[in-house]
Design a protein with these regions (language model features):
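Juxtamembrane intracellular "pre-TM" segments in multi-pass secondary transporters
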Residues: 1-10, 188-221, 406
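Helix-interface capping motifs at the ends of transmembrane segments in multi-pass membrane proteins
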Residues: 35-37, 91-98, 305
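Alpha-helical transmembrane segments of multipass membrane proteins
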Residues: 87-91, 154-158, 294-296
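Hydrophobic alpha-helical transmembrane segments
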Residues: 100-107, 111, 136-189, 250-251, ...
Length: 412
């Protein structure tokens, strides 16, 4: 039976898709407003940092609260905060009082709210589909988000060019509110009084558990390395639109759409490629193909090669993240699952935030293409860590190999 014939998964998938559309439109609008207010590469990269780094502060406590109180207690308030911040941004735009500090502050709050929603919402899929099809469900959910990544920026760029930033943000708020409606239907766990020290101990326990499990630890380090280097293509995308293409917000949205289209393509072909080799070899190849796509964009100053490089990097991005996300959800114990997913988000967005700041500084000191070249080198070097961790996994018992955990479920 098709996963989308499962009513609960269908609503889950649809709300993920629509809220993802809203999030991507917010992303495009906020980033492009920074380009118009202060177009320096460092400031454009700082927007991505403010959207990403809040995960360091909010993801793990949100995951712990989700495990203690239930997902509804986290998802609904955080999603309400997103809608409220969008409305405040709209007011400042209409009042013509929006400046760089306000924009960065709102980007930080939006990033924190999004970081709080993601672990609880993503781990919920393991409760509505059986484990044998969990990987397919995670992949299909990734297709929905990357379909949003394709359509959201294109729609955001179009509405920015035609209607302006205020109405663009209103549209994003309406789309984000859909997840709020579905989130209210989540089962509520009976409330209980929990002291802050209990939340801290819950976070500490999940970190210790993940650190002692080398499969989880290697997955976290791998995704952190990948995102630190790979975020260059997303954070500096608006500068590609203005420098290489000499265009505006609509072309920026279309370039983000190309990235999302590549991600959707990757979702459909990843099973064929992933099952042919050990997962560690598969991840190492994704690292190197991604590095190659960045290298081509660095070496060849061409519109065609840039578009192809963006498409290929989008495919690698999806294939790596969905595989590691499925690994963590199938390998981690149920009582730690939201917190393990939160730690995964911590590494993803922590890498995004630090990387965006670093590549913005590199682009400001040299050129945008130079940032792509240095990033390609670092991600190629990172592939050797994957090779090392893969060899270590092969020396472990077969039931704890990374590929077995991904394909067969938790080794418990």
């Amino acid at each position: 039976r098709s996963l989308l014939q499962n009513r609960h998964f269908c609503w889950y998938w649809l709300s993920t898709f629509l809220s993802g559309m809203g999030w991507m439109i917010q992303w495009v609008a906020i980033t492009w407003m920074m380009v118009e207010i202060d177009g320096r590469p460092e400031m454009v990269g700082l927007v991505q940092t403010c959207l990403s780094l809040p995960v360091i502060f909010f993801a793990m406590p949100a995951g712990a609260l989700s495990d203690l109180f239930g997902r509804k207690a986290v998802v609904v308030p955080a999603q309400m905060l997103i809608v409220l911040v969008v409305l405040l941004l709209v007011y400042l735009i209409i009042d013509q009082s929006l400046n760089v500090p306000w924009l960065l502050a709102f980007a930080f709050v939006l990033g924190g709210a999004r970081a709080s929603v993601s672990p609880a919402w993503q781990s919920y899929v393991s409760h509505i589909v059986p484990k044998p099809v969990l990987r397919k469900a995670v992949s299909l959910n990734s297709v929905g988000f990357n379909l949003a990544r394709t359509l959201g920026p294109a729609l955001g760029g179009l509405t920015l060019g035609v209607l302006g930033p205020a109405l663009t943000l209103v549209l994003s708020g309406l789309l984000s509110s859909f997840l709020l409606g579905v989130g209210r239907s989540l089962p509520r766990r009976r409330g209980r009084r929990v002291r802050p020290v209990q939340i801290w101990r819950s976070v500490q326990a999940s970190v210790i558990y993940s650190w002692k499990d080398h499969i989880l630890r290697d997955a976290y380090v791998t995704v952190g390395l990948f995102n630190f280097s790979g975020i260059v293509i997303i954070s500096l995308m608006p500068l590609l639109a203005t420098s290489l293409f000499d265009a505006g917000s609509m072309v920026y949205g279309l370039l983000m759409g190309v990235f999302g289209t590549g991600a959707i393509f990757g979702a459909f072909v990843q099973t064929k490629f992933a099952l042919q080799v050990d997962l560690g070899v598969y991840i190492k190849r994704l690292f190197r193909v991604f590095a190659l796509s960045l290298s081509v964009m660095f070496l060849v100053d061409s519109v065609v090669t840039t578009v192809v490089g963006i498409f290929v990097s989008g495919s690698c991005w999806l294939m790596l993240h969905s595989s590691l996300s499925a690994l963590i959800q199938t390998h981690s114990k149920e009582r730690y699952r939201s917190r393990c997913q939160a730690l995964f988000q911590f590494m993803i967005f922590g890498g995004n935030g630090i990387g965006a700041l670093v590549w913005g500084v590199v682009a400001g000191s040299f050129t945008v293409t130079a940032a792509f070249g240095v990033s390609a080198l670092t991600i190629f070097v990172g592939s050797f860590y994957v090779f090392y961790s893969t060899n270590r996994a092969r020396r472990s018992p077969p039931s704890t190999q990374i590929s077995s955990a991904l394909e067969n479920g938790s080794p418990e």
